[in-house]
Structure formats: structure tokens, C-alpha cells
A protein has these predicted regions:
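Hydrophobic, well-ordered beta-alpha structural blocks that scaffold small-molecule cofactor pockets
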Residues: 1-102
Length: 102
């Protein structure tokens, strides 16, 4: 549904969260024919790694993926609020440019 509606016409997805939820979400996106351009995470051990072929970046690098659609896939309490604040401060609009799925 997400690929056919909100993310339609965008250059792939940017998944916030390189943990179990984000990885599972990305696998399903790929099964459905979508592409994940990058993962965004705060964990320095994950940054610069690759997951399912996509790089893991720090939130400060999000502007490079402005043409993608961001999806917050983090289950940690408070993460959704933090991700929303980060994206909105960078000029992204909820629903138009990003949604939370976890």
C-alpha cells in the first residue's frame, strides 16, 4: 500500500532504524518490489555499514536522500517523536515526505 500511494513517484524509501524492525520492514519492501535507498540510525557501530545493499547513514546525512520517502521503523519509546522533530526541522512534512510504521 505504501509503495503504491504515499511513496509513489519517490526515489525509493529511506528507513529510519537499522534494527530488527527496520530490517524486517526493508525485507518486505524488497519482496513487494520496492527499493530501500538508505537506513538512518544513531548507533555509530551501524553507520557506514550496508544492510540489504543499502548504506546506513547518520541523521545528519538525510538531505542527500531528499527525493526518497522516509519511513520511521523504530520501536523504542520516544523514537517516533525524535524522528518527527528531526525531519520537520529539516523541512520534511509528515505524510507528504515521511510516515511512522512502528
Amino acid at each position: 500500500y505504501l509503495l503504491e500511494t504515499l511513496a509513489r513517484g519517490r526515489d525509493g524509501l529511506v528507513v529510519w532504524g537499522a534494527g530488527p524492525i527496520g530490517k524486517a520492514f526493508a525485507r518486505e519492501v524488497q519482496v513487494q518490489g520496492g527499493s530501500v535507498r538508505a537506513f538512518v540510525d544513531l548507533d555509530p557501530r551501524k553507520i557506514d555499514q550496508r544492510i540489504h545493499g543499502a548504506p546506513v547513514i547518520h541523521p545528519s546525512g538525510i538531505d542527500e536522500y531528499r527525493d526518497g520517502f522516509s519511513v520511521a521503523a523504530v520501536g523504542q519509546e520516544g523514537a517516533r517523536r525524535q524522528i518527527r522533530a528531526e525531519l520537520e526541522s529539516a523541512g520534511w512534512e509528515e505524510v507528504t515526505d515521511f510516515v511512522a510504521v512502528a
